[in-house]
Every structure is written in structure tokens, then in C-alpha cells.
Design a protein with these regions (language model features):
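Conserved helicase ATPase core of P-loop NTP-dependent helicases/translocases
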Residues: 57-60, 297-299, 307, 313-351, ...
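SF2 helicase catalytic motif II
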Residues: 96-145
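SF2 helicase/translocase ATPase core recognition
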Residues: 140-172, 177, 211-240, 342, ...
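Conserved two-lobed SF2 helicase motor
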Residues: 69-90, 298-299, 337-352
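Walker A/P-loop NTP-binding motif
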Residues: 1-18, 132-134, 165
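Conserved Walker A/P-loop ATP-binding site and its immediately adjacent core
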Residues: 19-43, 152-157, 301-303
Length: 443
């Protein structure tokens, strides 16, 4: 929000229209929709996410004007992995990988500002991401680098980020910086001086522990992501609609009641297909968090999902129905006390209540339960006595699936939570009513 406010304020105070716009947002793939939503919420501005459909024409949204003379769109969003696709024309693979070996798309010059979310992903000048972001940001009026962990390993992590910001010369240039601040076995020297110079040059930090009294003690946000199981999901959704039509047309109340359970099963199937399809996006998010030096609590339901996550993150610990009591306790103790244990994966039945996991202040849900109370209980594994930071909860929702609808019901209306206090039949009837409402236009 602060970056959005800063770029908007710069624009409003600029003597010449457009000094800070258009703006390019570079962020992890899982956060693109969130950035789009935040620009709309806090600045009232539409943002376009770059994809294959607008790969050749995205600039036209800025060049075309509305009746008041302003561009149709001034905010464009992409992820790190897509920089090559949208902004790099060619890379000379025969020569050493430097800025001179990269030919950028001329449309890069259109942007006047760049916001880089999770900028520690650009900390190496030897990677394509680091070089591409550097080239894109060169000569821009405003560049905002956002990260909770600007230094992941040692002081050398700041070099490329300062270079991207156009600030490395303020520290004497590369050689002087390395000599002054990267000496010794830990490549960290004159740390207090570096801290002072950063604060007085280009660095601003709001520590959660110091501003917690001004912030909500627990925040929730949903991240809409593409699923890799779209074809399978659409087929299952079509079957669901067919079944609901039969249910709707059934005249006998007893027949309708007997079909309640089947509708529940099919709704659960849709959730499962969506969950499997979100694994890729969730893995990218998890890598971003733990690579930034933070810990993460991750909740899911399916054994298949947990197995895939465990395969991607072999050092993660788990609290699931497959773990015995000793294994579960070991997982909790390791996560709480071992700084190298960054990820714990839990299902709701085994880990959703009772555990204290205050070593993390981030909780993510690749799947979520039917009830608000279960969601809240899971969130509170981190948000409990002993937690010093604001807790952030992330709900991953599959794009064009039932996820968003279910999330809204759970978080806002709490209809399902109320239903659970009744009998099983009441819960099933509630689910059927929700399904009928969700697919009403298709029945």
C-alpha cells in the first residue's frame, strides 16, 4: 500500500503529467492478482496483468486515451519469470552474461516507475532476474524495492538491489562498497555505518513489532491463482451442473434428501481438483517466503497435496494423520526451536487446533475447511500467546473455481459455520443450497 500511495502522490505533485506513470509492478506470480486488486482498492486505478493475450499489445492500453485525455491503463503487472518473455528481445549467449549482452524491448522505455515486490529475489547480479530487473529499471524516475528481508545472507545481498535502485554510487560504487562493508569471513563489516547510510539514503522500514498497536492483530488476504487442472475441473463442474438439474427437478422430498450426500461429494471433488491445480503456484509462494528467511505454516487436506509439497520441500516437517504422536511433537519442536526449519505442513484435523507455532507469523491455506471457526482455529496456531508480530494469513483460491465463492461464504456470511452446529443433515442441506446458488445461472 505504501508503494502505491508513494507513486500516486509523486504523480499528483509532478509539474508535468505522467512523471510517475505508467508504472510496472514486478512481483511473485502468486501475488499478481493481489497487486491488481490493491491498486483498485487504494488508488481507484485499473491494472493490467501481462499475459500471452496482450503480449504484443499491452502498450496500447496506455497509448489509447479516455474522454478526459488520461490513458485507459497506467499500471501493468508481471512476475519475475515472465520478464524475459515481455521485455527482452534477445540475449547474446556467445558472450559473457552482462547488461551489454541483453537487448531489451524498446517498450521498456514507456515506464516511468517500477515497483519491485520481494526485491531480494534480485540480489544476485549473476542471475537473469537480477540483470533483467536492472535493465528495466535503468533511467526510471522512481524505483521502489519492497522486501522484508533485504539481506538474506550477508551485506553482498544489497549490492545488486542498490544497483537496481540507482543508488550504489551513493555508497562509493561496487569496489568501495565491497571493501567497506563486505570484509571478513561473514562478508559483513561496518554494519552500523551501513545501516545509518541506508536509512539516510534510500531505506525505510516499518517493523511490525513497533507498529503493531496501529495494525490489525491478524490480517487475511486471498490470492487468486491459475490452476493446472482446468480441463479436469471443467469436466467435473459440468457433471455437477447435470446432477443439480436432476436434484432441482426431483419432486419427491425423500429423493432430494437422498441426493444431498452426493452433492456434497461432488462439491468436495471440485475443491480437491482445484487444490491439486494450485500446487505449482503455492510452491512458488513458499519458496519466496522461506528464501527470504521467514517461516511459514501451510495447511491442506489431501494426502496427495501434502505428498507433493513434501516432495518439493524435503526439509519441511509435517503434522498429519500419517504421523504418530512422537513425529508430530518432533515437527512442532523443530519448527519452534530450529531456525533452519522454515516450513511446517499440517492438515486441519491433526494440526488445526491446540498447537503453538508462534515461530512463524505467516499462515497459508492451499485448501480450507467448510467452517469459519476451523479457519480461525488454524490461523490461531500462530496468533496466540507468545506471538510478537502481526500475523498474515493467505488463502489460495483457484481462478474460475468454487474457491472464491466458498471463501466469501466462510469469511463473511459464516453460513457454513452456523450449519455445523446442527446435525449432519443440516450441514448437507446447507451445502446443497450453496451449490444451487453458485450454479444458478447454469441450471
Amino acid at each position: 500500500m505504501q508503494a502505491i500511495c508513494a507513486v500516486v502522490k509523486a504523480h499528483k505533485e509532478a509539474p508535468i503529467y505522467g512523471e510517475s506513470f505508467p508504472v510496472l509492478v514486478i512481483c511473485p506470480a502468486a501475488l499478481k492478482v493481489n497487486w491488481q486488486r490493491e491498486f483498485k482498492k487504494f488508488a481507484g486505478m485499473n491494472a493490467i496483468i501481462l499475459d500471452d493475450r496482450n503480449r504484443q499489445s499491452w502498450q496500447s492500453f496506455y497509448e489509447c486515451k479516455k474522454s478526459d485525455g488520461s490513458p485507459l491503463c497506467e499500471v501493468f503487472i508481471t512476475n519475475y519469470e515472465s520478464l524475459n518473455k515481455f521485455f527482452v528481445r534477445a540475449v547474446d549467449k556467445e558472450s559473457k552474461f552482462t547488461m551489454k549482452s541483453i537487448a531489451f524491448d524498446q517498450r521498456v522505455s514507456l515506464f516511468r516507475s517500477v515497483i519491485i515486490d520481494e526485491s531480494h529475489k534480485c540480489k544476485s547480479s549473476k542471475t537473469q532476474q537480477g540483470k533483467f530487473v536492472e535493465g528495466i529499471c535503468k533511467g526510471k524516475r522512481y524505483v521502489f524495492a519492497l522486501t522484508g528481508t533485504p539481506v538474506v545472507n550477508n551485506n553482498t545481498d544489497l549490492i545488486q538491489q542498490l544497483k537496481i535502485l540507482g543508488r550504489l554510487e551513493d555508497f562509493g560504487g561496487y569496489s568501495r562498497y565491497v571493501e567497506r562493508y563486505c570484509d571478513g569471513p561473514k562478508q559483513a563489516s561496518n554494519v552500523k555505518e551501513l545501516n545509518w547510510r541506508l536509512w539516510n539514503t534510500c531505506f525505510f522500514r516499518r517493523e511490525k513489532s513497533k507498529v503493531l498497536t496501529q495494525l490489525p492483530d491478524k490480517t487475511r488476504q486471498y490470492l487468486t491463482v491459475d490452476i493446472t487442472t482446468t480441463k479436469e475441473y471443467k469436466a467435473a463442474e459440468a457433471d455437477m451442473v447435470k446432477y443439480l438439474k436432476k436434484y432441482k427437478n426431483a419432486s419427491d422430498a425423500q429423493v432430494q434428501k437422498s441426493m444431498n450426500g452426493a452433492v456434497m461429494v461432488q462439491m468436495q471433488l471440485l475443491k480437491q481438483i482445484s487444490a491439486r491445480g494450485k500446487i505449482k503456484a503455492v510452491c512458488e509462494f513458499v519458496h519466496d517466503v522461506i528464501d527470504g528467511g521467514e517461516k511459514l505454516i501451510l495447511f491442506g487436506y489431501l494426502k496427495e497435496v501434502v505428498a507433493e509439497l513434501k516432495k518439493e520441500f524435503p526439509k519441511a516437517v509435517t503434522v498429519t494423520g500419517s504421523d504418530n504422536v512422537n513425529q508430530k511433537q518432533y515437527a512442532v519442536d523443530s519448527f519452534q526451536n530450529n531456525p533452519d526449519c522454515k516450513l511446517i505442513i499440517l492438515n486441519f484435523k491433526s494440526g488445526g487446533t491446540g498447537l503453538t507455532l508462534t515461530a512463524a507469523s505467516r499462515v497459508a491455506f492451499i485448501e480450507f475447511p467448510w467452517t469459519f471457526s476451523d479457519c480461525e482455529q488454524a490461523e490461531d496456531r500462530a496468533h496466540r500467546n507468545g506471538q510478537k508480530n502481526n500475523v498474515n494469513c493467505y488463502y489460495f483460491l483457484g481462478k474460475d473455481t468454487i474457491d472464491k465463492y466458498m471463501y466469501d461464504v466462510i469469511q463473511t456470511k459464516k453460513n457454513i459455520a452456523n450449519g455445523v452446529t446442527g446435525t449432519d443433515d443440516q450441514v448437507e442441506e446447507n451445502m446443497v443450497n450453496l451449490a444451487m446458488d453458485l450454479f444458478r445461472d447454469k441450471l
